[in-house]
């Protein structure tokens, strides 16, 4: 039986009595954000709104984005990435579980030196895919041109943020490339791999 989103007590500054809020609302107040689903317009708008609001509230405290996502739509993913670059606070990205496709693109978009993967996390990169398998030829050609532009944009970002040469990133994006946390670190997608049972990072 589903139990819904758990609620936890929260006491606002200056208030005597605590109120019950859902756990994600409580964590947002600590600047901890979550991408735990496929990337679509709804979650993109939520995360963009939260990042902008929290930046207005305090532009000196870092934000932390936890990622466990199979990927999703390219444009909503790019809007999350662009917002991360735009807001004044540094955005830490933390991969737990899987960061695939647009999930890995958002992961690599964290502040360089502040991108982390948990030890058993997996990362996957590949090129954007088309949704027009049975479209008329004209529409298919237009979409193919747009896909090439999007692929070029994504490739440039991976090159810039991983430090890998263009030919390496282009080759990797030809197919699904899965990586362990350590391989993602070697590839420049994350900077740190968490060490189990300690507060240190490797």
UniProtKB/Swiss-Prot annotation:
InterPro entries: ClpP, ClpP/crotonase-like_dom_sf, ClpP/TepA, ClpP_His_AS, ClpP_Ser_AS. One of its GO terms (biological process) is protein quality control for misfolded or incompletely synthesized proteins. It is found in: Plastid, Chloroplast stroma. It catalyses: Hydrolysis of proteins to small peptides in the presence of ATP and magnesium. alpha-casein is the usual test substrate. In the absence of ATP, only oligopeptides shorter than five residues are hydrolyzed (such as succinyl-Leu-Tyr-|-NHMec, and Leu-Tyr-Leu-|-Tyr-Trp, in which cleavage of the -Tyr-|-Leu- and -Tyr-|-Trp bonds also occurs). GO terms for cellular component: chloroplast stroma; endopeptidase Clp complex. Its EC number is 3.4.21.92. Component of the chloroplastic Clp protease core complex. Belongs to the peptidase S14 family. One of its GO terms (molecular function) is ATPase binding. HAMAP family: ClpP. It is an enzyme of class 3 (hydrolase). Cleaves peptides in various proteins in a process that requires ATP hydrolysis. Has a chymotrypsin-like activity. Plays a major role in the degradation of misfolded proteins. The active site is at 101 (nucleophile), 126. Keywords: Chloroplast, Hydrolase, Plastid, Protease, Serine protease. This is ATP-dependent Clp protease proteolytic subunit. It comes from the Eukaryota. PANTHER family: ATP-DEPENDENT CLP PROTEASE PROTEOLYTIC SUBUNIT (PTHR10381), CHLOROPLASTIC ATP-DEPENDENT CLP PROTEASE PROTEOLYTIC SUBUNIT 1 (PTHR10381:SF15).
């Amino acid at each position: 039986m589903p139990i819904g989103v758990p609620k936890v007590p929260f006491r606002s500054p200056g208030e005597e009595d605590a109120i019950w809020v859902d756990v994600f609302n409580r964590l947002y107040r600590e600047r901890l954000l979550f991408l735990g689903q496929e990337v679509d317009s709804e979650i993109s708008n939520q995360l963009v709104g939260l990042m902008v609001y929290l930046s207005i509230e305090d532009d000196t405290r870092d934000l932390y984005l936890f990622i466990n996502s199979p990927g999703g739509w390219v444009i909503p993913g790019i809007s999350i990435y662009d917002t991360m670059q735009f807001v004044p606070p540094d955005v830490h990205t933390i991969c737990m579980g899987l960061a695939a496709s647009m999930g890995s693109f958002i992961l690599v978009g964290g502040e360089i030196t502040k991108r982390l993967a948990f030890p058993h996390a997996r990362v996957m990169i590949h090129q954007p895919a088309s949704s027009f398998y049975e479209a008329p030829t004209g529409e298919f050609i237009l979409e193919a041109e747009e896909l090439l532009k999007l692929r070029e944009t994504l490739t440039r970002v991976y090159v810039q943020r991983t430090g890998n040469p263009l030919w390496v990133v282009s080759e990797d994006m030809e197919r699904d490339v899965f990586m362990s946390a350590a391989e993602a670190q070697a590839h420049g997608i994350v900077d740190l791999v968490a060490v189990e049972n300690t507060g240190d990072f490797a």
